[in-house]
Amino acid sequence: MFVEMSVCDSPNKNSKLDKKSLTPFKKVRRKNWKQEAAYKSDTSKGQEVSYVGERFIPNRFERENIEFNLKYIGKRKERDILETGVTLTASYWRQSGFISNINRTFGIGERRLFQFSSQQGTRSRVVDNDSADSDWPCNPRARPYAIQNATHEMPGICSPVDYNMMDWSSGGMVAMSSGQDVMLWRNLDESTMVFSVESPTSLKYSPDGKHLAIGCMDRNYPVLDLWEVRSPTEFLVSYRKLFFKSMGYISCIEWSHDGKEVICGTQCGVIIVLAMPTLNTLMQLREHRHTVKKMKFAPTHKYFASSDTDGKIFIFDAVLKVRLLKLDGRSIVFDWHPWTGEDLAVAERSPASIFIFNIPRRQFVASYRRRDDRIVIKTLTYSKITGELLVNVIRRDDADLAVCEILVLASLNRVVDLMSHQDRGTLFLMWNPDGTKIATGGLDDTFSLWNFFPTYKREAILRKQEQKAKDKCSSLSLYKGIR
């Protein structure tokens, strides 16, 4: 499935393949450079060394390779994004801040400070500096906002991390389970409520936060319980669905965007679509042959993706539930881009590999691939506000100790932030509903909350979007009135 590509490279970044990546000029040697070099060689013998007035003749390169030399075309060699750490991250923020301040001070709209051509008859326009060098649509933050603001003790939270056993509802309720009971609390700042559930295997809140679906066991039979959230402290089991014993257990749960369907992935690989609120079976999808590990709808409601423990990903039509394509890999994790709904970020845990797959084109548009097992990818997820890709990695340091950190990528060759803790490490758990906060776990059984994006900036973005929608509606109304 995956095409062999060089590390830290994407198809549109290879200067030897993409002629547009070359500079608009061509270096040409002087015609008599050989005579100058020979004269310099002859006259230098037997003379005293002088440091005044001497002419420096640089080393020569083969003419056919001169255009592809990184030194001449002005491109820095791409570095390994999973091993850069604080060094590259700090340099990015310094460079980004310097460029933005210079442009703001002098009113520069173009990326280059100097333009050696006539500007008469042309209008200056602001150009997206990163559009030509991005592997997906992204608007990275102006500076690193991600800081820890709360830490709680929670034994067993990272042994191991199961993303199907935790969720954060739109109503602010957090549900988690370590396989024994289900713990519920509101906004991480109130007392925890513990409910006794027999062998919970998965859980998921509805989009409106009014229902909580819990997969559990009743003796040897898999069961789906539907809890109605009546208040922050009151829950009612409104419906229960009993499955055949051959299904094994409910491994993961997903809701449709309108909350009218509940999709259950099972141990045997069957995906069951249920209707709300009676939980009647609408259809069964039998593409997988192994335990279904993750299911997720695209944000545009057009596609539905599912993956299993064997590394296979199936893409379905979100409405008809018809299989569109299949991807093969090894121990795969994935996430949809929050804006396009067509770009699927796919990662293989080891050797660490990241691929950006475009569904309509049915091809990989960018890739990163390691050739060793030193780094393992735990999971990856997009920020729905900025479009940045968060990659949770586990690696060994010089003392052979496990280091867990979250790399924030604006592209497959650009690290823009690093979320880490020197002592306990950082394991990604989940986003809060509006995408401004991140919950993480530590190797010392701690639960931490990070501010990823300022709330006031998020509110400003929402107000701007609402204003644009109102302006668009008013323009359409005016157009209809004219007609």
From Swiss-Prot:
Cited Pfam families: WD40
SUPFAM superfamilies recorded: WD40 repeat-like
PROSITE patterns attached to this UniProt entry: WD_REPEATS_2, WD_REPEATS_REGION
WD repeat spans: 158-195, 196-237, 245-284, 287-326, 421-460
Reported modifications of this chain: Probably ubiquitinated: degraded following egg activation by the anaphase promoting complex/cyclosome (APC/C).
Record's keyword terms, sorted: Cytoplasm, Developmental protein, Differentiation, Meiosis, Oogenesis, Repeat, Ubl conjugation, WD repeat
Distribution of this protein across tissues and organs: Highly expressed in ovaries. Expressed in nurse cells from stage 6 to stage 12 egg chambers. As oocyte matures, it is transferred from the nurse cells to the oocyte.
Gene3D superfamilies tied to this protein: YVTN repeat-like/Quinoprotein amine dehydrogenase
Sequence motif D-box, residues: 424-432
Keyword Transmembrane on entry: no
InterPro entries: Cdc20/Fizzy, WD40/YVTN_repeat-like_dom_sf, WD40_repeat_dom_sf, WD40_rpt
Ranges that cross the membrane: none
Subcellular localization: Cytoplasm
GO molecular function: anaphase-promoting complex binding; ubiquitin ligase activator activity
Keyword Cytoplasm recorded: yes
A Gene Ontology term for the protein's cellular component: cytoplasm
GO biological process, one term: egg activation
Conditions for induction: Transcription is activated by grauzone (grau), which binds to its promoter region.
Domain of life: Eukaryota
Role description: Female meiosis-specific activator of the anaphase promoting complex/cyclosome (APC/C). Required for the completion of meiosis in oocytes. Activates the ubiquitin ligase activity and substrate specificity of APC/C and triggers the sequential degradation of mitotic cyclins in meiosis. Promotes the ubiquitination and degradation of CycA early in meiosis I and the degradation of CycB and CycB3 after egg activation. Promotes degradation of mtrm at the oocyte-to-embryo transition.
Family: Belongs to the WD repeat CORT family.
Quaternary structure and partners: Interacts with anaphase promoting complex/cyclosome (APC/C) subunits Cdc16 and Cdc27. Interacts with mtrm.
Protein name: Protein cortex
The species this protein was found in: Drosophila melanogaster (Fruit fly)
Species classification: Eukaryota, Metazoa, Ecdysozoa, Arthropoda, Hexapoda
